[in-house]
Every structure is written in C-alpha cells, then in structure tokens.
C-alpha cells in the first residue's frame, strides 16, 4: 500500500529539549524553575505505567498560577533536531505530515505552524487569564500511542497501512507495529531497531528511506 502520510513522534524525534527524554514536559517544568520537583515526579511515575494520567495531573498542579507567556518564552522556538528544517519541506511535497505525541500541544502547534505540517494530537495544560490553572488536557496516553494512532488516522481519513511513523523511544513500539512503514530515529533502545522496518541517526535520510522502503513493499505486493 502506498505511503500517504508521515507521522512523527515529537520529543526526541522532531525536537531535542534538555532532559533525559528530550521532553517538552521537562522543558516546561524546568523553564518554570521546578526542575527538582519535576525530576522527582518523573522518577516516581515513569515506572508506573498505569498511573500516567495521574503523573500529568501532578505536573499540571506544580505549574498552577505560573505565567504561560514567561514560560513559553523560554522554550519557544523549540530546539529542532538537526536536519528537521531542511527535511520537512522535502517530505511535504509528497506526503501529509503530522505529529502524534504525549508531549505538549503548545509545542506541537508551534511546530505545525512553523514548518507547515498538517495535523497533530498531543496533551496539554489548561490556561485561564494568562496563567496555568493546574489542570491537564489528557489526549495521548504515554504507553498506548497505538490506540491514539487509530483515532488520529480515523480523524484524518487515513488507513494506518498508508502511514509511515517515525519515533525514538520504547513507547513508540506499539505504533510502529500498527503502521505500513516504521522508522526508528536515533533509537534510544535496541528494541526499537527490532520493531522498525529501518532505522537511522540522520534525520536527513528519512525521505530516501521512505522512498526505498515503499518501492520494496510495492515489489513484494
């Protein structure tokens, strides 16, 4: 089946913030001056896969009352992965481009507008009168991104077999097993290499990888 869309993980794939997971969540917590508290929550909740929504709420509560503008000024524009700016326009000529992330919608929305990408699905934080309210917007569960991929494909009129997904971490593996073509980018664990059709450490190689893999699939069909 022909690849019609390329969907990217965001944190560690499109952008590389400071922190163990290059995460937009870490970026916003650190920018708010909450590094110690933020890291403590990460250490507690990351192993507890069934408590991800609780983790989001705990992070959101730490930000309650903090100015959104001041925090976003420190993390936008995002630190794009080398090669992103020159590669996305090339991909855009042939494919629809999207983001599926458990990261923050502030960042995903900025990237889509900045690079001309087409759609995204991401988590978020509630804002009122210019400050964080302490509430979260729960849209993408960290460990079940494959379910959210199906939701996103349905929303965008795509068959998952028409999708190339690009991700970097263990929570991306279920998505990789659900799409027509999976690329592990700068994989953080050997299991991603096993799950993906192909892998690379150079973002600029992605268009050629998609083209070559698509030809191989067409021949096998």
Where are these regions (language model features)?
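Acidic, Mg2+-coordinating phosphoryl-transfer loop and its flanking beta/alpha structural elements
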Residues: 97, 101-102, 160-201
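Short, acidic/turn-prone active-site loops that include or flank metal/cofactor-
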Residues: 122-127, 187-191, 204-206
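Short, acidic loop-to-helix structural element flanking the phosphoryl-transfer center
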Residues: 68-105
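Surface-exposed amphipathic alpha-helices with a cationic face
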Residues: 85-93, 145-146, 150-157, 177
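Glycine-rich phosphate-binding "P-loop"
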Residues: 62-78, 133-140
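Substrate-recognition "cap/lid" segment bordering the active-site pocket of phosphatases
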Residues: 109-163, 170
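Active-site neighborhood of HAD-like aspartate-dependent phosphohydrolases
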Residues: 1-47
């Amino acid at each position: 089946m022909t690849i019609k869309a390329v969907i990217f993980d965001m944190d560690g794939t499109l952008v590389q913030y400071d922190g163990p997971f290059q995460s937009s969540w870490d970026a916003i917590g650190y920018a708010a001056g909450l590094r110690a508290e933020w890291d403590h929550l990460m250490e507690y909740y990351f192993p507890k896969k069934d408590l991800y929504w609780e983790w989001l709420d705990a992070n959101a509560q730490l930000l309650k009352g903090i100015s959104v503008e001041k925090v976003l000024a420190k993390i936008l524009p995002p630190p794009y992965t080398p090669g992103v700016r020159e590669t996305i326009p090339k991909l855009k000529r042939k494919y629809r481009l999207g983001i599926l992330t458990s990261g923050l919608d502030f960042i995903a929305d900025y990237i889509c507008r900045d690079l001309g990408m087409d759609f995204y699905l991401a988590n978020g934080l509630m804002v009122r009168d210019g400050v964080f309210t302490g509430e979260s917007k729960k849209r993408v569960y960290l460990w079940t991104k494959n379910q959210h991929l199906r939701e996103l494909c349905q929303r965008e009129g795509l068959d998952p077999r028409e999708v190339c997904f690009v991700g970097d971490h263990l929570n991306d593996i279920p998505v990789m097993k659900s799409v027509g073509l999976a690329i592990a980018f700068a994989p953080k664990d050997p299991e991603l290499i096993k799950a993906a059709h192909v892998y690379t450490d150079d973002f600029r190689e992605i268009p050629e990888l998609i083209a070559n893999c698509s030809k191989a699939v067409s021949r096998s069909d």
